[in-house]
Structures are given as C-alpha cells and as structure tokens.
C-alpha cells in the first residue's frame, strides 16, 4: 500500500511540473520538428528574407548559334571591305586627275564629253576659269549584299562618298560639292577544268541614278554654271570611279580565303539562298 501511494504522489508532482513548463517559451532551436521542406527562413541583411528564386543558381540554357549563312555573308563583305581599303582605294580616288580628264573629254577630245565640254565652255565662260578640281575626303561606306532570285549570283553594292573642291577665282572662294555614288559588282561561282571552284567578277558598273551631287558649302555660283558643271561631272565621274573600283574587286576575289570561297561557291552553284540583310 505504501508503494502504491508513493507512485500516486510522484505522478501528481510530474503532472504539475509539466503544466508549469507548458507556459514557458522554448529555448532557441528546441522547437518541435517542422514538416519536410518547411524549414525556417534564413535572415538576410537586416531581417530581409531570401526569396526562393534567389537562393540557388538557376540553370541557363545555352544561346542558339547564329545562322551560318549570316556569318558567311558577313565574312564575305568584311573581306571585300578590308581588301578595298588595304588595296589603297581611297588614295587612288584622291589622285584621280579630274580636271585633266574633264578638259580632255575623258582622254578623247572628239568624244561625247569633249564635245559637251566645248559647247558648255562656249556658252558658260565661267567653266574656262576652273583652276582645279580635287577629290578629297573619300569614304568607303558599309557594303550591301543581296542574292539573285535563282540563288546563283551575289550582288555587292559598294557605296562611296567624296568631296569635290572646285577652285574658281571668279566665284571668289573654294566651291565644295558632296558626291555619293554606288558601284554594283556581280559575283559568280565557276569551276575550272580541274574541278576547282572560284568566285569571279561578272558585271561591274555604277548603279543607275545612284550619283548624287549637292552643294556642300562655298559662295553660291550662277545657277547655270552649277547645273552645267554637275552635268559634266555626271558624265565623267561614274566611269572614272568604276574604272578604279572594279579591278580592285576582281583582285580581291582571286585572293580570298580558300575555305570562305568554297563555302560561298557551294551555295551559289546549288542555288541555295543566303540569309542576307540588305
């Protein structure tokens, strides 16, 4: 009986202690276990919680490569631009003896330009007083590239810009004209007798209507003089510049990287379309 009574007293004391402890706060880290994946948030920078999306690095899908034909077209135009510049195109344009060509009628005093100049100088005496016409500040602008509808040819647009300094004492100061002209070169792929593939130059000429001449600065001359001078330049300049650019393009094509030539030629021979930005 004494043993049973002692157990009853002990159980009562334990129940009383448990009731008292239930009202006290639990020590840090001794809380009841939480369900899986619901752990307490971690503190970050003055109590801010770290969002789940910023907690772990996310896998990033690799970027898709560009279309190979886009890269091929860019490499081709870059090679042409670099070849024209390294071939001295800008210096060649600056050294064109434009006044001598105009006065000689393009090397043929009996030709169209020579006859035209003779008529103009007789009707507009100011043209006789031209002391010099100098090409300055030649620029090679960004090349354009398109493919023929059948896929067998490329057409390269070579845009040029330059300034003409016209020295005329009668006018009273230097007259400057801004000139823009596009040369268009046709490129084809051919196979020789040994089966080797080459890129060759087809037609190469100035684009009709692409020549633009405008008064840049200087004393405004008599309008008839400006019109007649522009008319002469329109007859002379395109063929002069074309004669300098086209041989350079032909030489560049023959010296292009073999792999680049092969890749482009294969597409042209089979008529496969490039993805080319105009």
UniProtKB/Swiss-Prot annotation:
Belongs to the BPI/LBP/Plunc superfamily. Plunc family. It comes from Mus musculus (Mouse). Keywords: Antibiotic, Antimicrobial, Disulfide bond, Glycoprotein, Immunity, Innate immunity, Lipid-binding, Repeat, Secreted, Signal. The gene is Bpifa1. Detected in airway epithelia (trachea and lung) and in bronchoalveolar fluid (at protein level). Upper airways, nasopharyngeal epithelium and thymus. Highest expression in the trachea and progressive decrease from proximal (bronchial) to distal (bronchiolar) airways. No expression is detected in the terminal bronchioles, respiratory bronchioles or lung alveoli. This is BPI fold-containing family A member 1. Disulfide bonds join 204-246. Residues 1-19 form the signal peptide. Monomer. Interacts (via N-terminus) with SCNN1B, a subunit of the heterotrimeric epithelial sodium channel (ENaC); this inhibits proteolytic activation of ENaC. Residues 23-52 are annotated as: 4 X 6 AA repeats of G-[LPQ]-[PL]-L-P-L. GO terms for biological process: antibacterial humoral response; innate immune response; multicellular organismal-level water homeostasis; negative regulation of single-species biofilm formation in or on host organism; regulation of sodium ion transmembrane transport; surfactant homeostasis.
